[in-house]
Structure formats: C-alpha cells, structure tokens
C-alpha cells in the first residue's frame, strides 16, 4: 500500500527501465515531486528490446502500465533524450537522486561454471547480447552462444538469431538448455522451441579459446575437446551494473550539500542485476524507503519478547 508522504521531497530518477519507472510511479503517488530522466527517446530500458524477442511480446506491458500511471500524476515530469552527468545532476539540485541505469551483458566467459576468462580470445569475434539487440548483424553468419546464465535469455536470443537467418550453436555447461527454467516450468518449452528451430545444442561443455574463426570447447566431465566453426561468439554469462554516474556522484560527495543533494542511491540492475520482476521490486522498495529505511528484522522477525522502546 502506498501511503501519502508527510514530507514532500524533490527526487530525480535517472533511467526509465523497470526499476526507474516503478520508483517514479510510487514516488509520484506518494506525493513527491519527481523528475524522470532517460537518455534515449523511448522509455522502458531493457523491456523495450527484450519484448521484441520470440515469445516475450507481453513483457512490454510492464512498461506500458507504468507509463500510463505516471502520465496521470501531475507531479511527475518525464525528460526523454536527457543524458545525465554528475555535473548536470548536481546543477539540478534535487534532494534525492535515484540511479537506475541498468546493467550490460559482459563480454567474457566468467559465469556460474567459470571464475576465469577465455584463455585466448579474438575480441573481434566476441559480441554481447546487448549489441546484437541494438545493432543486428544483417549478413548471414555463424553464431555460437555460450550460455552460462541458464535462464531464458540464451534460448530466446538463439531463436531470434535463427529467425534472422543465421546459423546458431547454443553451448551450455549445464546438462540442458535453460536449466533454471526447471523451477519456473519454462525448461521444456524452451528446449522444444530451440530444437524445432534447428539450433545445434551442445551441453556439458565449457568454452576456452575463441580464435581464427572457431571456438574451442571441452567437456566438463571427461575433458574431451571439441572445435566449433563460428563467426561470432556471444557470451551470456553475467551482467555488469552500469554505475558510472553513481560512482562519479559518490566521488563528489563534498559538493552535494552546496547543491541541495541529500542522498544518492542506486536501484534495480544498477545495484544487483537480476530478472525484470526483481528490478520492479527494487524500484518499489526504494520509493517507500525514501524517508525511512526499511528493516526486515525489525518488522518481520519473530521475537520471544517485545522490543524495548
């Protein structure tokens, strides 16, 4: 339940992904004066690109509903195509600053099954999942997706590349594609669609070398080597938070007071990369805690004796 605040504040939210939109919506409903700044023309962040992938079109509702609610609040201003720097944030002088700048897929092999990078890699062959969605490669190519994330993204990205006419090989250290989907009832559907699309699947293999138009793999159990011909390798291993603005602001903390800034926080994928639902929760929680930080221990822990006040 959103409770109207007794002390209205000015809040700047940077980034309009699921976390930024939810934080803006709740802050506005609480009665705070909110400015939402987005560097691109279209609001939505990762939702915009992921909703275009096979089977994920309904995800755009996460954005659409929140934009509808934001448009109903006269105390929320939205500024698209507004790239923010530490100087511009300080110049605006909002009391609280919420950084929701998201995260980007890494271009290395560090993931759940590996704590080290490729032994050798031609970085011209390495392309991130974000780069594929933002700038699709038009010429027909051979893609190898290395999925050490084990959820939906590796599978749907493989389907998207196959739909574009590319030859796709999906490699995973796990025993099945989308292994985490076993807990969300998505694994069977994911594997079925991948196989129907004609995508070559190689399970129980890790990637070691990316050079000279091929990727060198080895079995995680037997150590048996395997070489796969490819033009590009797409590591789906982990996301790295985009915290440049947050870090820059924190390095200038001595200038906050003179510019009216009281607090700077990061939320959503910028704080801890996860699924869209987690980003929405992070945005909601940051908004309701804007005045009073929430303590799960204080509010929900069962105690033998009442707290002494």
Positions of the model-derived regions?
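N-terminal Rossmann-like dinucleotide/flavin-binding domain of flavoprotein oxidoreductases
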Residues: 45-95, 181-208
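Short polar/acidic secondary-structure junctions
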Residues: 207-208, 220-222
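Generic beta-strand structural signal
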Residues: 209-210, 266
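Short polybasic amphipathic segments
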Residues: 213-218
